[in-house]
């Protein structure tokens, strides 16, 4: 990866709740100002068997939080004997971001997971949390959200959700210069976390 990870920005992320799972998707481009510094950046990360996070913002801040969350998830399992809930992970992220206001994380996070049902949370850089049925974050979010709002329906199947999330990121790729290089797609269902083949076109 070229450039400083702390200065590189990741751009458009998307989350969709389906009947039988949650889909998280993101583009693969990182930029430094107007320069493309990487075409293979990962912006969606597994935290535990049924928990994942997607980040739009400074790559270094995103990776730092992911390391912290993975450690906290392991500690929670060791203490409690089970995986934390999706809401508990969202609350943890919110507390970390809120407590770091004087040295903030420059990123916006989507938390997706499955406990008793599929859940999706959006968390801004100040720690504000909202539960969503669908959401987009990052520089291309307005283009992705327009497509999501027009095409999302409650109770859609997982395959439909995957297709919708990919199309939403592609809509951002077409219109936003900071979004590009294909789409990373992850599905979290009752069976667990599954990363699909990247969509490169």
Swiss-Prot record:
The formation of the proteasomal ATPase PAN-20S proteasome complex, via the docking of the C-termini of PAN into the intersubunit pockets in the alpha-rings, triggers opening of the gate for substrate entry. Interconversion between the open-gate and close-gate conformations leads to a dynamic regulation of the 20S proteasome proteolysis activity. Keywords: Autocatalytic cleavage, Cytoplasm, Hydrolase, Protease, Proteasome, Threonine protease, Zymogen. Pfam families: Proteasome. It catalyses: Cleavage of peptide bonds with very broad specificity. The active site is at residue 11. Its main location: cytoplasm. One of its GO terms (molecular function) is threonine-type endopeptidase activity. The keyword Hydrolase applies. GO terms for cellular component: cytoplasm; proteasome core complex, beta-subunit complex. Its EC number is 3.4.25.1. InterPro entries: Ntn_hydrolases_N, Pept_T1A_Psome_bsu_arc, Pept_T1A_subB, Proteasome_bsu_CS, Proteasome_sua/b, Proteasome_suB-type. It is found in: Cytoplasm. It comes from the Archaea. The 20S proteasome core is composed of 14 alpha and 14 beta subunits that assemble into four stacked heptameric rings, resulting in a barrel-shaped structure. The two inner rings, each composed of seven catalytic beta subunits, are sandwiched by two outer rings, each composed of seven alpha subunits. The catalytic chamber with the active sites is on the inside of the barrel. Has a gated structure, the ends of the cylinder being occluded by the N-termini of the alpha-subunits. Is capped at one or both ends by the proteasome regulatory ATPase, PAN. NCBIfam families: arc_protsome_B. Belongs to the peptidase T1B family. This is Proteasome subunit beta 1. It comes from Thermococcus gammatolerans (strain DSM 15229 / JCM 11827 / EJ3). The lineage of its organism: Archaea, Methanobacteriati, Methanobacteriota, Thermococci, Thermococcales.
């Amino acid at each position: 990866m070229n450039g400083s990870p702390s200065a590189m920005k990741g751009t458009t992320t998307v989350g969709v709740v389906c009947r039988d799972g949650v889909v998280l998707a993101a583009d693969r481009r990182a930029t430094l100002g107007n320069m493309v510094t990487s075409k293979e950046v990962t912006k969606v990360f597994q935290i535990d068997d049924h928990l994942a996070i997607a980040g739009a913002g400074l790559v270094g801040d995103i990776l730092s939080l992911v390391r912290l969350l993975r450690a906290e998830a392991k500690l929670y399992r060791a203490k409690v004997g089970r995986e934390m809930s999706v809401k508990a992970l969202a609350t943890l992220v919110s507390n970390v971001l809120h407590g770091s206001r004087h040295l903030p994380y420059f990123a916006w996070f989507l938390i997706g997971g499955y406990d008793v049902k599929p859940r999706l949370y959006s968390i801004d850089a100040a720690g504000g949390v909202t539960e969503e049925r669908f959401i987009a974050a990052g520089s291309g979010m307005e283009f992705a959200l327009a497509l999501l709002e027009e095409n999302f329906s409650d109770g859609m199947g997982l395959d439909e959700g995957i297709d919708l999330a990919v199309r939403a990121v592609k809509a951002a790729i077409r219109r936003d210069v900071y979004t590009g290089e294909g789409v990373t797609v992850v599905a979290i269902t009752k069976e667990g976390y599954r990363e699909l083949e990247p969509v490169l076109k």
